[in-house]
Amino acid sequence: MVFLKKSLLLVLFVGLVSLSICEENKREEHEEIEENKEKAEEKRGWMSKIASGIGTFLSGMQQG
């Protein structure tokens, strides 16, 4: 009976440790995805500013 209790505790402990590791990996992946989204949005913002600047420059050259 004592052997079964120890075995059960060991199985529960190993299960909790592996669950904790999985949660940590999932959290890291989620943070990485969010970081990539932020970088992509930042790039889009810069590209639109550059395109707007080029458009303004070209329209100024046509008028002048």
Swiss-Prot record:
Keyword Cytoplasm: no
Propeptide residue intervals: 23-42
Native source organism of the sequence: Phyllomedusa bicolor
Gene from which this protein is expressed: PLX-B
Residue ranges crossing the lipid bilayer per the database entry: none
Tissues and organs where the protein is expressed, per its UniProt entry: Expressed by the skin glands.
Cleavable signal peptide: 1-22
Protein name, entry field: Phylloxin-B1
Superkingdom of the organism of origin: Eukaryota
Subcellular location(s) of the protein: Secreted
Cross-referenced InterPro entries: Frog_antimicrobial_propeptide
Biological process according to GO: defense response to bacterium; innate immune response
